[in-house]
Regions:
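Alpha-helical oligomerization segments with coiled-coil/rod-like character
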Residues: 1-47
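Short hydrophobic beta/alpha edge segments that flank linear recognition/processing sites
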Residues: 34-36, 84, 112-115, 143-157
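Short glycine/threonine/proline-enriched tight-turn/helix- or strand-capping micro-motif at secondary-structure
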Residues: 41-46, 61-95, 116-117
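A structural signal for short beta-strand/turn segments enriched in small hydrophobics and glycine
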Residues: 62, 91, 97-99, 139-151
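Short beta-turn/strand-loop junction motif enriched in small, turn-promoting residues
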Residues: 68-71, 98-104, 118, 147-153
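Zn2+-dependent peptidoglycan hydrolase active-site motif and core
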Residues: 76-79, 88, 93-138, 157-168
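Acidic, glycine-rich catalytic/binding loops that coordinate metals and/or anionic ligands
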Residues: 137-140, 165-208
Length: 208
């Protein structure tokens, strides 16, 4: 996984991660989960099994790729995910899953949502940042058609857009290892080379 120094400020601080993990622990304790019990199957709702990923907007454009960039806030850094704007501002879950956490990151993502997924038996997480509104809560079961929030410009943001992170593993899960990966490794998007924005008109069309 990338270090916070390399990622700059567009990531959760250690204090924010600890706060989120405490909230998550409290949630599962109140849901009746016992020590060493699998959190994907305890509580009020089980984590559903999915088969694929979908784009999180019904239409939009790519405005920033994953990887090294020059950030207006922090200089050269690794951009931890992909940025999307234009089009429809409703944000959908990228796959079936369970809402792990919703919160606010003052120095980075602003209003954000973390969802855990089980895709073909493998663990993944998705994070949606800079939201204007959040429509789900911790523990909610979602699918690809669930509108989870609205695109916004909260946190460290220069304009209305969605920031999407994908992790291998369950992010914010105590005792679990989760590493950032390029969302393009799992979700098909049109190519963006830093010039004209790369647009897409739906959630399914395949781009080479």
């Amino acid at each position: 996984s990338k270090s916070k120094d390399a990622l700059g400020e567009e990531s959760l601080s250690y204090e924010e991660e600890l706060k989120a993990q405490k909230s998550i622990l409290d949630y599962y304790t109140k849901s009746g989960c016992k020590d060493n019990e699998d959190v994907s199957s305890c509580g009020s709702a089980q984590l559903p099994a999915g088969t694929k990923f979908w784009r999180p907007l019904s239409s939009g454009c790519i405005t920033e790729n994953y990887g090294y960039r020059i950030c207006p806030f922090h200089g050269k850094e690794i951009h931890s995910g992909m940025d999307m704007a234009c089009g429809d501002h409703k944000i959908y879950a990228v796959s079936d899953g369970k809402v792990k956490y919703t919160g606010y990151s003052r120095g980075g993502y602003g209003n954000y949502i973390v969802i855990h997924h089980n895709i073909n038996g493998r663990k993944y997480s998705s994070l949606y940042g800079h939201l204007a509104a959040i429509y789900v809560k911790q523990g909610d079961i979602v699918n690809k058609d669930t509108v989870i929030g609205l695109m916004g410009s909260t946190g460290a943001s220069t304009g209305t857009h969605l920031h999407l992170n994908i992790y291998n593993g369950w992010y914010l899960q105590a005792g679990e290892s989760a590493s950032l990966t390029d969302p393009r490794n799992y979700i098909n998007f049109p190519t963006y080379n830093g010039g004209a924005y790369a647009r897409f008109a739906d959630r399914t069309t395949y781009y080479n």
